[in-house]
Amino acid sequence: MQSKKNLLTLHPEKVISKTTIEKHLEYLVMYIEKVNSPQDIKGLNINELNVLADEIRTGVLNRVSNHGGHVGPNLGFTEATVAMHYVFDAPRDKFVFDVSHQVYPHKMLTGRKDGFLKVDDMNAISGYSSPRENSEYDLFEVGHTSTSVALASGLQAARDLLGEKYNIVVVLGDGSLSGGEAFEGLNVAAEAGTNFIVLFNDNGMSIAENHGGMYKSLAALRESNGESSNNIFRALGFDYMYVEAGNNVEKLVEAFRKVKDIDHPIVVHLHTEKGHGYQPAVEDKEAWHWSVPFDLKTGKPKNVDGGESFSDLLGQYLVKKAELDDKLLVVQSAVPAMSGLSKERREALGKHYVDVGIAEEEAVALISGAAKAGAHPVWGTPATFMQRTYDQLCQDLAVNGNPAVINVLGASIYGMNDFTHICFFDIPMFSHIPNLVYLAPTTWEEFIAMEDWAIAQDAYSVALRVPCAVVHSDEEYPTDYSQLNKFHVAHRGSQVAVIAAGGFYQKGEAVLRLLADEGINATLINPRYLTGVDEQLLDELKRDHQLVVTLEDGSLDGGFGERIARYYGPTDMKVLNFGVKKALYDRYDVNDLLRDNHLTETQIVADIKAVLA
């Protein structure tokens, strides 16, 4: 039976019209509103499963258009998710989603549909796999890529050790295969030799286009209907099955039934379409990987910020820099948009551009090698992904002292705020690596001055904490930062010194104004360097200051402020450190976070006055 007024797509080869979604949400009563667990779809026939897939796709579009989120990955894996839950028996069978960019349909089928159908409930549901939502269907908190196979290999080892019987099903995207941990997991799972089903979701895309030699092999498999002898999965020790119609529920159900309860590892290669069912997402797969809230009819953002963005300015800068510097090598790891590198700008960079895929470890080793060979490499990626390559930062780069440049993006409480994507743990990570200089520019102009110096110099590995907000200044900044750890005194006063780092420098200026209203002429310092202290200046402050205040847009534990407090430890100088306390944060409200950590300007001033009293 089909929906009485199902004007949505009833077949996977068709495309949902941009004009139908909102007015047809009211008709989502045939199947999805009655589904509270995968058991509720077991009795449906193929035609009914197709209708269910359409209803799920409509729910996905309802959420992302109102709340923002991952668009293309979820639309492209809708049919496969329906087929998974129809054939396999979760939660007894274990599903592990890589990066979980495609987890929305899964959530709708496992009791969380209200987070997609009802606008008021959307904040309650994470955009990622999350057992914290009290769901037995989500096994792991997942948000970074290439981890699913390794996590699932642990399930495999425990299942086999305990003599249990269930299917382990891994959802792995082709973009995720560019990360080394995916291969480590595949290697281990293949050697175990027991039930281990990898659903390889191949839509020919990462976030942007795929990069790497193995993607030619994957293309050959697609073009030969899986018959190519150049099969990377068989070479790793997996059995293999190819499904060309990766957005066809009937074909997927047929394939999954063949591999259910299999007694050895197998890869089921699904050829899917990223953005399937929503034409704008099909036509521009990169732009629609993730989106802010948008108008379904036009595809345009609902809230347009007409101001400058740091990423756009950075992209312009890098293209212009390549025109002036024949040695410049711009390196990305699958997220070029974060550095303002549109497809047109990537093409303009030409040989100056390298994308290593989702492989941050490779990126750091590559820029170290490139610097050694005389290039001027610059790599940028969000701070949350820097955590994936700490060993390479220490060993391959800093120990060797090669003069590569790293742009640490979004490192701020104003950056990404999902549980798995918190971006303010970078200062403890970078600032304690010997032989690496970590700079904290406060404005766009200061960033350019520091970046130009970092690229031109050949003495240090240099990282820059790129501000989130665009702040302009007519101040003349130094062009040489080789005198390390030399802080800049912007305003000299007495009694209280405020050392405000990076993106919190403007907060420091606001605090100074409030203190002036209280009759306190405080000193304001831009430290510029996060990897050391200006001992001479700190000693000078002891003469006519009784309190030093540090402000940092990051973690207090192991942060910049603790370095200042440690220096003053044996002295009579009082120190107040302001930053974010150690905790697990998830989808926080920035204003709440500021208040909870006493980071509003009025709270800071009140705390300063309390110490001085």
Which residues make up each language-model segment?
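Glycine/charged-rich beta-loop-alpha catalytic/anionic-binding loops adjacent to active sites
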Residues: 58-65, 124-141, 164-169, 343-354, ...
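Glycine-rich ThDP/TPP pyrophosphate-binding loop and its adjacent helix/strand module
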Residues: 138-295, 300-307, 311-316, 436-545
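Short, positively charged and aromatic/hydrophobic N-terminal segments
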Residues: 9, 16-20, 24-27
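Peripheral docking tails and interdomain loops at the edges
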Residues: 293, 301-304, 415-417, 437, ...
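N-terminal amphipathic, basic-rich helices that act as targeting or association modules
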Residues: 29-108, 245
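A glycine-rich helix N-cap at a beta->alpha junction
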Residues: 115-125, 191-205, 398-410
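Non-catalytic terminal/interface segments that mediate subunit docking, oligomerization
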Residues: 93, 278-387, 392-402, 500-502, ...
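Cofactor-binding active-site loop characterized by glycine-rich and histidine/acidic residues
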Residues: 70-192, 328, 333, 342-343
